[in-house]
Amino acid sequence: MLDTKPSATRRIPLVIATVAVGGLAGFAALYGLGLSRAPTGDPACRAAVATAQKIAPLAHGEVAALTMASAPLKLPDLAFEDADGKPKKLSDFRGKTLLVNLWATWCVPCRKEMPALDELQGKLSGPNFEVVAINIDTRDPEKPKTFLKEANLTRLGYFNDQKAKVFQDLKAIGRALGMPTSVLVDPQGCEIATIAGPAEWASEDALKLIRAATGKAAAAL
């Protein structure tokens, strides 16, 4: 009679392959590899995809982890508050290219990233660009303000969402897999690129890419 049971030696490669696949999945979840893409696109955001394609050659070095938009995607009109507790929405910034960043004081990579975001805001903010860093601490509302003050990060505007709904809203469309999360948004509120994890936003790599996204260097591409 033929032995139909797989031998131990034949099962070993299968086990190894299963472990390898599981390990890869965990790595992707931790570092945001393979951000889920929108199955259908918003026609109003086609220009943002064209911008993403145009600046894609600049996504290297310190910003190599950026995932460029491959389908038109309008971001939710994220709701949060400013430093005075007044309500703000993402749509309040229409007309500007934005780097929307979600951060928290309990997130070590977030805290390390904040000085670079502050420097980026100082170098490029203006009529065409702004960093919108939204804190999602849910307990002590003074803690993030104290952190920014003690770190002498004075150029960033202060925005917060104590319910952390902005994170859930981005997670619902596959754009928030961990912290920090940053989305480069065009003047119409459409995704250009997304990164899960920190980046050196004050680096020359980042500055060149963002200048290109705002149109200042598009002609050079």
UniProtKB/Swiss-Prot annotation:
One of its GO terms (molecular function) is disulfide oxidoreductase activity. It is found in: Cell membrane. Residues 1-11 are cytoplasmic. CDD domains: TlpA_like_family. GO terms for cellular component: plasma membrane. Pfam families: Redoxin. Residues 69-215 form the Thioredoxin domain. The keyword DNA repair does not apply. The chain crosses the membrane at residues 12-35. Residues 36-221 are periplasmic. InterPro entries: Redoxin (IPR013740), Thioredoxin-like_sf (IPR036249), Thioredoxin_CS (IPR017937), Thioredoxin_domain (IPR013766), Tpx_Peroxidase_subfamily (IPR050455). Its main location: membrane. GO terms for biological process: cytochrome complex assembly. Keywords: Cell membrane, Cytochrome c-type biogenesis, Disulfide bond, Membrane, Redox-active center, Transmembrane, Transmembrane helix. Disulfide bonds join 45-190, 107-110. It is a single-pass type II membrane protein. Involved in cytochrome aa3 assembly. Monomer. PANTHER family: THIOL PEROXIDASE. Belongs to the thioredoxin family. This is Thiol:disulfide interchange protein TlpA. It comes from Bradyrhizobium diazoefficiens (strain JCM 10833 / BCRC 13528 / IAM 13628 / NBRC 14792 / USDA 110).
